[in-house]
Structures are given as C-alpha cells and as structure tokens.
C-alpha cells in the first residue's frame, strides 16, 4: 500500500498524466509499473519508438521525467524508489486496443478472465482485431486451430517469442 491508502494502481494512475504529455515524438509510452523488487521499490516507465530505444534515449527521458515526478503533491510514493526508463523488450505488453491493432500479424500470448473451450491462455498468431474481437491461429498439439476471443475477456496480452 502507498501513503494515504493509495494502491499501486492508483499510484500509476497519478503518475501517468504527469509523464504521458512529456514523452516526445517519436517515443510511445507503453506502460508504467510500480513494484517492490527485493527490498527496493521500482517505478518502471516503458517506452519505445519504431527503431528501438538507445541508452542515450533512456538517459534523455530520465532527465525529462525525474524532476516532474518530484513535483507531484502530495507525494504518492510510500518510500524512496528507483526510476527505471526502459524498453518493453521482446515480450512487450499489449495493454490498449491500439497496441493490439498494431500487433496483428505478430505472435502473441493472451490470458483470459474466463476459459474458452477449457483454455485460459492462448499463444499464437493474431490474425485480426476489430476493436471488439481478436482472431488467433494457434497450435493445439499438432493441429492448427483458430479461436475468436471477445476483447472484454482479455485479462492480459503481450507479444511472445516463438520458439
């Protein structure tokens, strides 16, 4: 828990409107995470751009974002934290409808709130997304199958690495 009963989700909700407007083009704010790793709290701001981000990019973004976080009143952070600006990596989260639209044609992993045909996690190629339903092809043992998933049933989605 954070100060004054704020949850981690609330902390992220407080930080997002401060950070999002200052992320310059061509960068995209992918996600903000706040978690305790070992004995330290870490605020991770995941950014990307079409050609990928560099160490210099993360340093420049840190110089922009860090002073702004210190201006949030009242201070939403329960303790000292480390600020981490990084790439979302190969298995970047797909948290918005737009990120799913951009992922059409890519190999993804989708976790559901409720099972479809006794399956709660699908991994395969996202063949279509219309804003309301995802269409995926996946391998069930040795058989290629297709599944249609209502967007509202998606608990979590991310790009996946095909092995």
From Swiss-Prot:
<dbReference type="Pfam" id="PF17384">
    <property type="entry name" value="DUF150_C"/>
</dbReference>
<dbReference type="InterPro" id="IPR028998">
    <property type="entry name" value="RimP_C"/>
</dbReference>
<dbReference type="GO" id="GO:0005829">
    <property type="term" value="C:cytosol"/>
</dbReference>
<protein>
    <recommendedName>
        <fullName>Ribosome maturation factor RimP</fullName>
    </recommendedName>
</protein>
<dbReference type="Pfam" id="PF02576">
    <property type="entry name" value="RimP_N"/>
</dbReference>
<keyword id="KW-0690">Ribosome biogenesis</keyword>
<dbReference type="GO" id="GO:0000028">
    <property type="term" value="P:ribosomal small subunit assembly"/>
</dbReference>
<comment type="function">
    <text>Required for maturation of 30S ribosomal subunits.</text>
</comment>
<dbReference type="InterPro" id="IPR003728">
    <property type="entry name" value="Ribosome_maturation_RimP"/>
</dbReference>
<dbReference type="InterPro" id="IPR036847">
    <property type="entry name" value="RimP_C_sf"/>
</dbReference>
<dbReference type="InterPro" id="IPR028989">
    <property type="entry name" value="RimP_N"/>
</dbReference>
<comment type="similarity">
    <text>Belongs to the RimP family.</text>
</comment>
<keyword id="KW-0963">Cytoplasm</keyword>
<dbReference type="InterPro" id="IPR035956">
    <property type="entry name" value="RimP_N_sf"/>
</dbReference>
<dbReference type="GO" id="GO:0006412">
    <property type="term" value="P:translation"/>
</dbReference>
């Amino acid at each position: 828990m954070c100060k004054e009963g704020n949850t981690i989700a609330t902390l992220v909700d407080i930080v997002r409107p401060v950070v999002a407007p200052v992320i310059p083009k061509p960068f995209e704010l992918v996600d903000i995470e706040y978690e305790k790793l070992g004995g330290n709290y870490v605020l991770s701001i995941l950014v990307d751009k079409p050609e990928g981000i560099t160490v210099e990019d993360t340093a420049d973004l840190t110089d922009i974002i860090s002073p702004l976080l210190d201006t949030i009143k009242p201070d939403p952070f329960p303790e000292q934290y480390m600020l981490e600006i990084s790439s979302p990596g190969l298995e970047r989260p797909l948290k918005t409808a737009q990120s799913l639209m951009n992922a059409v044609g890519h190999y993804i992993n989708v976790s559901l709130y409720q099972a479809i045909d006794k399956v709660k996690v699908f991994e395969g190629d996202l063949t279509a997304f219309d804003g309301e339903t995802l269409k995926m092809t996946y391998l069930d043992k040795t058989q290629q199958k297709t599944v249609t998933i209502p967007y509202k049933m998606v608990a979590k989605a991310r790009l996946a690495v095909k092995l």
